[in-house]
Amino acid sequence: MVQIVISSARAGGLAEWVLMELQGEIEARYSTGLAGNLLGDLHYTTEGIPVLIVGHHILYGKIIHLEKPFAVLVKHTPGDQDCDELGRETGTRYLVTALIKDKILFKTRPKPIITSVPKKV
């Protein structure tokens, strides 16, 4: 099971992110890995159903509200550029940067997108 965190825009306060849960495994085409690369396009239908397009495949999902939200933490250790207001270094601290309250679940197999198949005459 692959879990990917993406950011969604929100005005003021902490950022609110959405967790995407996919069944199976996603492999990068090249050995560079997936970090920092575009995975696909996320769209919503007029009914609010999430649709993920990855390459020549399409996945339909559903939005699930999490019972207990997740917090996204950033670890700051002494020696980092960020020190507290007095300029003194303290122990390791964690900064909450975002909350995850919802997830998008894609539990069905991806369907291939076929535009048109030419017929041989």
From Swiss-Prot:
<dbReference type="InterPro" id="IPR018607">
    <property type="entry name" value="Ctf8"/>
</dbReference>
<comment type="subunit">
    <text>Component of the CTF18-RFC complex, which consists of CTF18, CTF8, DSCC1, RFC2, RFC3, RFC4 and RFC5. The CTF18-RFC complex does not interact with the Rad9/Rad1/Hus1 complex. The CTF18-RFC complex interacts with POLH. CTF18/CTF8/DSCC1 associate with PCNA. CTF8 exists as a dimer with DSCC1.</text>
</comment>
<keyword id="KW-0238">DNA-binding</keyword>
<dbReference type="GO" id="GO:0006260">
    <property type="term" value="P:DNA replication"/>
</dbReference>
<dbReference type="Pfam" id="PF09696">
    <property type="entry name" value="Ctf8"/>
</dbReference>
<protein>
    <recommendedName>
        <fullName>Chromosome transmission fidelity protein 8 homolog</fullName>
    </recommendedName>
</protein>
<comment type="similarity">
    <text>Belongs to the CTF8 family.</text>
</comment>
<keyword id="KW-0235">DNA replication</keyword>
<keyword id="KW-0539">Nucleus</keyword>
<dbReference type="GO" id="GO:0031390">
    <property type="term" value="C:Ctf18 RFC-like complex"/>
</dbReference>
<dbReference type="GO" id="GO:1900264">
    <property type="term" value="P:positive regulation of DNA-directed DNA polymerase activity"/>
</dbReference>
<dbReference type="GO" id="GO:0007064">
    <property type="term" value="P:mitotic sister chromatid cohesion"/>
</dbReference>
<keyword id="KW-0131">Cell cycle</keyword>
<dbReference type="GO" id="GO:0003677">
    <property type="term" value="F:DNA binding"/>
</dbReference>
<comment type="function">
    <text>Chromosome cohesion factor involved in sister chromatid cohesion and fidelity of chromosome transmission. Component of one of the cell nuclear antigen loader complexes, CTF18-replication factor C (CTF18-RFC), which consists of CTF18, CTF8, DSCC1, RFC2, RFC3, RFC4 and RFC5. The CTF18-RFC complex binds to single-stranded and primed DNAs and has weak ATPase activity that is stimulated the presence of primed DNA, replication protein A (RPA) and proliferating cell nuclear antigen (PCNA). The CTF18-RFC complex catalyzes the ATP-dependent loading of PCNA onto primed and gapped DNA.</text>
</comment>
<dbReference type="GO" id="GO:0005654">
    <property type="term" value="C:nucleoplasm"/>
</dbReference>
